[in-house]
Protein backbone atom coordinates (compact mmCIF):
# COMPACT_ATOMS: atom_id res chain seq x y z
CA UNK A 1 0.00 0.00 0.00
CA UNK A 2 1.62 3.27 -1.12
CA UNK A 3 -0.70 5.61 0.77
CA UNK A 4 -1.23 5.13 4.47
CA UNK A 5 -1.69 7.44 7.42
CA UNK A 6 -1.62 7.19 11.16
CA UNK A 7 -0.96 9.88 13.73
CA UNK A 8 2.05 7.91 14.95
CA UNK A 9 3.61 8.82 11.58
CA UNK A 10 3.42 12.55 12.40
CA UNK A 11 5.74 13.35 15.32
CA UNK A 12 4.92 17.06 15.10
CA UNK A 13 1.25 16.39 15.81
CA UNK A 14 2.11 14.17 18.76
CA UNK A 15 4.51 16.75 20.24
CA UNK A 16 1.85 19.45 19.98
CA UNK A 17 -0.60 17.31 21.97
CA UNK A 18 2.04 16.42 24.57
CA UNK A 19 3.03 20.06 25.05
CA UNK A 20 -0.61 21.05 25.44
CA UNK A 21 -1.41 18.41 28.06
CA UNK A 22 -1.10 19.18 31.78
CA UNK A 23 -0.01 15.64 32.61
CA UNK A 24 0.84 13.69 29.43
CA UNK A 25 0.91 9.91 29.69
CA UNK A 26 0.84 6.96 27.35
CA UNK A 27 -1.48 3.97 27.70
CA UNK A 28 -0.23 1.08 25.62
CA UNK A 29 1.63 -2.18 25.49
CA UNK A 30 5.10 -0.86 26.25
CA UNK A 31 6.96 2.35 27.01
CA UNK A 32 7.08 5.04 24.36
CA UNK A 33 9.58 7.88 24.41
CA UNK A 34 10.00 9.81 27.65
CA UNK A 35 6.28 9.97 28.45
CA UNK A 36 4.97 8.32 31.59
CA UNK A 37 3.71 4.86 30.69
CA UNK A 38 0.58 3.27 32.14
CA UNK A 39 0.21 -0.29 30.81
CA UNK A 40 -3.17 -1.02 29.30
CA UNK A 41 -4.97 -4.21 30.32
CA UNK A 42 -6.93 -7.13 28.94
CA UNK A 43 -8.88 -9.55 31.13
CA UNK A 44 -8.55 -13.14 29.95
CA UNK A 45 -12.00 -14.64 30.44
CA UNK A 46 -12.13 -17.52 27.97
CA UNK A 47 -8.74 -19.28 27.78
CA UNK A 48 -9.99 -21.50 24.97
CA UNK A 49 -8.14 -24.46 23.56
CA UNK A 50 -6.55 -23.98 20.14
CA UNK A 51 -9.04 -23.89 17.29
CA UNK A 52 -7.62 -26.42 14.83
CA UNK A 53 -8.66 -24.61 11.66
CA UNK A 54 -6.58 -23.02 8.90
CA UNK A 55 -9.10 -20.32 8.09
CA UNK A 56 -7.84 -16.83 8.97
CA UNK A 57 -9.89 -14.35 10.98
CA UNK A 58 -9.69 -10.56 10.75
CA UNK A 59 -11.47 -8.67 13.53
CA UNK A 60 -10.42 -5.05 13.08
CA UNK A 61 -11.14 -1.81 11.27
CA UNK A 62 -10.14 -1.70 7.60
CA UNK A 63 -7.36 0.83 8.23
CA UNK A 64 -4.22 0.76 6.11
CA UNK A 65 -2.14 0.06 9.22
CA UNK A 66 -4.21 -3.09 9.83
CA UNK A 67 -2.98 -4.44 6.46
CA UNK A 68 -6.13 -6.31 5.35
CA UNK A 69 -4.60 -6.65 1.87
CA UNK A 70 -2.28 -9.33 3.31
CA UNK A 71 -5.27 -11.69 3.07
CA UNK A 72 -5.80 -11.56 -0.69
CA UNK A 73 -6.17 -15.11 -1.96
CA UNK A 74 -6.41 -16.63 1.54
CA UNK A 75 -9.53 -18.30 2.95
CA UNK A 76 -10.58 -15.68 5.51
CA UNK A 77 -13.46 -14.52 7.66
CA UNK A 78 -13.86 -10.81 8.44
CA UNK A 79 -15.64 -8.97 11.24
CA UNK A 80 -15.58 -5.36 10.14
CA UNK A 81 -17.57 -2.66 8.34
CA UNK A 82 -18.76 -4.12 5.02
CA UNK A 83 -18.77 -0.66 3.45
CA UNK A 84 -15.07 -0.31 4.21
CA UNK A 85 -14.43 -3.63 2.48
CA UNK A 86 -16.25 -2.26 -0.57
CA UNK A 87 -14.02 0.83 -0.46
CA UNK A 88 -10.92 -1.36 -0.67
CA UNK A 89 -12.45 -3.34 -3.54
CA UNK A 90 -13.22 -0.17 -5.48
CA UNK A 91 -10.18 2.00 -4.75
CA UNK A 92 -7.39 -0.54 -4.24
CA UNK A 93 -8.83 -3.19 -6.57
CA UNK A 94 -8.57 -5.70 -3.75
CA UNK A 95 -9.54 -9.29 -4.51
CA UNK A 96 -11.92 -10.36 -1.75
CA UNK A 97 -13.27 -13.48 -3.44
CA UNK A 98 -11.82 -15.74 -0.71
CA UNK A 99 -13.35 -13.70 2.11
CA UNK A 100 -16.57 -14.03 4.04
CA UNK A 101 -17.50 -10.77 5.76
CA UNK A 102 -19.72 -10.21 8.79
CA UNK A 103 -20.72 -6.61 9.39
CA UNK A 104 -19.34 -5.37 12.68
CA UNK A 105 -21.75 -5.09 15.60
CA UNK A 106 -20.28 -5.28 19.07
CA UNK A 107 -23.10 -7.47 20.34
CA UNK A 108 -22.13 -10.09 17.73
CA UNK A 109 -18.48 -10.29 18.78
CA UNK A 110 -18.78 -13.57 20.70
CA UNK A 111 -20.65 -15.10 17.78
CA UNK A 112 -17.79 -14.22 15.47
CA UNK A 113 -15.09 -15.46 17.83
CA UNK A 114 -16.91 -18.81 18.11
CA UNK A 115 -16.72 -19.31 14.35
CA UNK A 116 -14.42 -22.00 12.99
CA UNK A 117 -11.26 -20.01 12.29
CA UNK A 118 -7.94 -20.75 13.91
CA UNK A 119 -5.43 -18.17 12.65
CA UNK A 120 -5.63 -14.48 13.46
CA UNK A 121 -4.37 -11.76 11.13
CA UNK A 122 -2.72 -9.69 13.84
CA UNK A 123 0.15 -8.29 11.76
CA UNK A 124 -0.91 -4.67 12.32
CA UNK A 125 1.71 -1.92 12.18
CA UNK A 126 1.95 0.91 14.74
CA UNK A 127 -0.24 -1.08 17.13
CA UNK A 128 -0.33 0.80 20.46
CA UNK A 129 -1.75 -2.11 22.47
CA UNK A 130 -3.44 -4.73 20.33
CA UNK A 131 -6.69 -5.51 22.13
CA UNK A 132 -7.86 -7.67 19.22
CA UNK A 133 -4.60 -9.65 19.44
CA UNK A 134 -5.20 -10.42 23.11
CA UNK A 135 -8.78 -11.31 22.23
CA UNK A 136 -7.72 -13.75 19.52
CA UNK A 137 -5.24 -15.47 21.84
CA UNK A 138 -7.92 -15.69 24.55
CA UNK A 139 -10.24 -17.46 22.10
CA UNK A 140 -7.65 -20.00 20.94
CA UNK A 141 -6.54 -18.42 17.66
CA UNK A 142 -2.88 -18.54 16.55
CA UNK A 143 -1.85 -14.96 15.64
CA UNK A 144 0.49 -13.84 12.90
CA UNK A 145 2.12 -10.76 14.42
CA UNK A 146 3.96 -7.74 13.08
CA UNK A 147 7.69 -7.55 13.72
CA UNK A 148 7.29 -4.42 15.87
CA UNK A 149 4.66 -5.86 18.25
CA UNK A 150 6.24 -7.23 21.43
CA UNK A 151 9.56 -7.58 19.55
CA UNK A 152 11.47 -8.97 22.55
CA UNK A 153 9.17 -11.98 22.73
CA UNK A 154 10.57 -14.87 20.69
CA UNK A 155 7.62 -15.64 18.43
CA UNK A 156 7.97 -17.64 15.20
CA UNK A 157 5.14 -16.19 13.10
CA UNK A 158 5.66 -12.55 12.14
CA UNK A 159 5.06 -10.69 8.89
CA UNK A 160 5.49 -7.21 7.45
CA UNK A 161 4.52 -7.87 3.82
CA UNK A 162 1.87 -9.93 2.02
CA UNK A 163 4.56 -12.37 0.92
CA UNK A 164 5.82 -12.87 4.47
CA UNK A 165 2.25 -13.27 5.70
CA UNK A 166 1.49 -16.01 3.19
CA UNK A 167 4.72 -17.78 4.11
CA UNK A 168 3.85 -17.74 7.82
CA UNK A 169 0.28 -18.78 7.09
CA UNK A 170 1.50 -21.82 5.16
CA UNK A 171 3.84 -22.77 8.03
CA UNK A 172 0.97 -22.68 10.54
CA UNK A 173 -1.19 -24.80 8.24
CA UNK A 174 1.38 -27.60 8.52
CA UNK A 175 1.36 -27.67 12.34
CA UNK A 176 -0.28 -30.41 14.35
CA UNK A 177 -2.79 -29.53 17.04
CA UNK A 178 -0.21 -30.10 19.77
CA UNK A 179 2.36 -27.96 17.96
CA UNK A 180 -0.19 -25.16 17.81
CA UNK A 181 -0.82 -25.52 21.53
CA UNK A 182 2.92 -25.33 22.17
CA UNK A 183 2.93 -21.96 20.39
CA UNK A 184 -0.29 -20.43 21.71
CA UNK A 185 -0.29 -21.39 25.39
CA UNK A 186 3.13 -19.86 26.27
CA UNK A 187 2.16 -16.68 24.40
CA UNK A 188 -1.08 -16.48 26.37
CA UNK A 189 0.75 -16.87 29.67
CA UNK A 190 3.18 -14.13 28.67
CA UNK A 191 0.33 -11.77 27.77
CA UNK A 192 -1.33 -12.27 31.14
CA UNK A 193 1.13 -9.81 32.66
CA UNK A 194 -1.21 -7.16 31.16
CA UNK A 195 -4.20 -8.63 33.04
CA UNK A 196 -4.12 -6.13 35.93
CA UNK A 197 -7.15 -3.85 35.67
CA UNK A 198 -6.79 -2.59 39.24
CA UNK A 199 -3.28 -1.26 38.65
CA UNK A 200 -4.46 0.54 35.51
CA UNK A 201 -7.50 2.01 37.30
CA UNK A 202 -5.60 3.17 40.38
CA UNK A 203 -2.88 4.95 38.40
CA UNK A 204 -5.42 6.80 36.26
CA UNK A 205 -7.35 7.88 39.35
CA UNK A 206 -4.15 9.28 40.84
CA UNK A 207 -3.64 11.44 37.76
CA UNK A 208 -7.26 12.58 37.51
CA UNK A 209 -7.31 13.54 41.20
CA UNK A 210 -4.13 15.63 41.09
Identify the residue ranges that each predicted region occupies.
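Conserved donor-binding/catalytic core segment of Leloir-type glycosyltransferases
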Residues: 47-66, 75-77
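A charged, aromatic-enriched C-terminal amphipathic alpha-helix characteristic of glycosyltransferases
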Residues: 163, 174-209
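Short beta-strand->alpha-helix junction loop in the catalytic core
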Residues: 29-48, 83-85
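Short hydrophobic beta-strand element within catalytic cores of glycosyltransferases
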Residues: 138-146
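A short, active-site helix/loop in glycosyltransferases that binds the activated sugar's phosphate group
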Residues: 7-37
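Conserved active-site histidine-acidic residue motif and adjacent donor-binding/catalytic loop
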Residues: 83, 91-115, 124-127
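Nucleotide-sugar-dependent
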Residues: 63, 106-107, 119-132, 145-155
Amino acid sequence: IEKSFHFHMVPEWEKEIIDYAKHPFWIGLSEWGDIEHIPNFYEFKHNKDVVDSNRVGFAARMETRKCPHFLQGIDSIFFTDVNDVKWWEKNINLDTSMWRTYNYKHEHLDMFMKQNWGISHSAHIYEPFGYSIFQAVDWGKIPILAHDWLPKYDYPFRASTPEQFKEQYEKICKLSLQEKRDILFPLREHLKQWDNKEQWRDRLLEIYNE
